[in-house]
From Swiss-Prot:
It catalyses: guanosine(1207) in 16S rRNA + S-adenosyl-L-methionine = N(2)-methylguanosine(1207) in 16S rRNA + S-adenosyl-L-homocysteine + H(+). This is Ribosomal RNA small subunit methyltransferase C. It comes from the Bacteria. It is found in: Cytoplasm. Keywords: Cytoplasm, Methyltransferase, rRNA processing, S-adenosyl-L-methionine, Transferase.
Length: 338
């Protein structure tokens, strides 16, 4: 995690309000403010595994990773500090799930960059709480409100489904390509025009669409899917189940929990961390790929054409090839030497 974000710097302008309170941090947490702030107690819920890895070093069991927080974890908290994500639907999903395990009257602080859509917070509350803006700085806004009544949350009501070829894709809010297959993934899938065998790893799997489409076409292909996002993990499991496909779905920070070696590693890797551009995950994906490929195994990824991956592929593998491209995207392939 990086230095404090602008959103956290806005929170710190109000630090005196938190010193005697029991805080719950949640949402799009991009730094370690929760480990530094002065409060009676601090707990953190995150659905991002790599952020949880950073937080548990200091917070231990007071940091929780998962799709939704459990009531036993939030018990005793009297103040919620929520970081607004870039997806409004994800914010609605997360806030409703949090409100369902928090007491009526709890203090709620919602902070986010203005470009994230945080200023529409009141319109998305469905009467659960009323907010007023209490600060604006660093191109961020901070809102305060209180939970006005008990809230019910049914996860089954939040699923979305669509089809790609003959594959059913199930998604939750906050997962990449939640409503339809993105152009980059479609280009990547188009390059697999021959039968596949062996085992395949789909990194940053999102809703599992890449692995599911390839697994449906190649029944002998052994599938492993990984992501850092708890919503992506749940979505991928649901996608495999809907298509009667077997596969291992692993929460992993790139290769952190991946032990096997593969014939194929595929990915449409992210290049954003929240609203910021970040190439760290893809850098790790490429650099460490030879350690997780069998001799002759292939890494095949799709990326925006302007991103600086060719030199890194050559440095790591010795060479690479571009096997498909449009004006916006390129599909790169590199092979581990025997």
């Amino acid at each position: 995690m990086s230095a404090l974000t602008p959103a956290s710097e806005v929170i710190l302008r109000h630090r005196e309000q938190f010193s005697s309170h029991h805080l719950l941090f949640a949402g799009d947490i991009q730094d370690t403010l929760a480990t530094q702030i002065d409060a009676a107690s601090v707990r953190v819920h995150t659905n991002q595994y790599h952020h949880w890895q950073s937080l548990i070093r200091t917070l231990g069991e007071s940091a929780w990773f998962g799709l939704v927080a459990e009531k036993a974890f939030t018990q005793g908290c009297d103040t919620l500090i929520y970081y607004w994500p870039k997806s409004k639907q994800e914010a609605r999903f997360q806030l409703r799930s949090l409100f369902s395990v928090l007491p009526k009257g709890i203090n709620i602080f919602i902070v986010g960059e203005n470009r994230s859509g945080v200023r529409s917070v009141d319109k998305l509350m469905d009467g659960m709480a009323t907010f007023r803006k209490i600060d604006s700085a660093r191109r961020c806004s901070l809102f305060y409100g209180q939970l006005e009544h008990e809230v019910q949350f049914e996860q089954d009501n939040w699923w979305n489904s669509y089809q790609v070829e003959n594959v059913i894709v199930n998604t939750l809010p906050g997962v990449f390509s939640q409503d339809e297959l993105d152009v980059g993934s479609r280009l990547l899938l188009s390059t697999f025009d021959k039968p596949l065998s062996g085992n395949l790893l789909d990194i940053a799997c999102g809703a599992g669409v890449l692995a599911a489409v390839l697994g449906k076409k190649n029944p002998e292909l052994a599938l492993t899917l990984s992501d850092v996002n708890a919503a992506a993990i749940a979505s991928s499991k649901a996608t495999l189940k809907a298509n009667k496909l077997e596969g291992h779905v692993v929460v992993s920070n790139v290769y952190s929990n991946i032990e096997d070696k593969f014939d194929w590693i595929i990915s449409n890797p992210p290049f954003h961390e929240g609203l910021k551009t970040s190439l760290l995950a893809t850098d790790d994906l490429i650099r460490q790929a030879p350690n997780h490929l069998k001799p002759g195994g292939k890494l095949r990824i799709v990326a925006n054409a302007f991103l600086p991956y060719p030199d890194l592929l050559d440095k790591t593998f010795g060479t690479h090839e571009v096997i498909a491209q449009t004006g916006k995207f390129k599909v790169y392939q590199a092979t581990k030497k025997f």
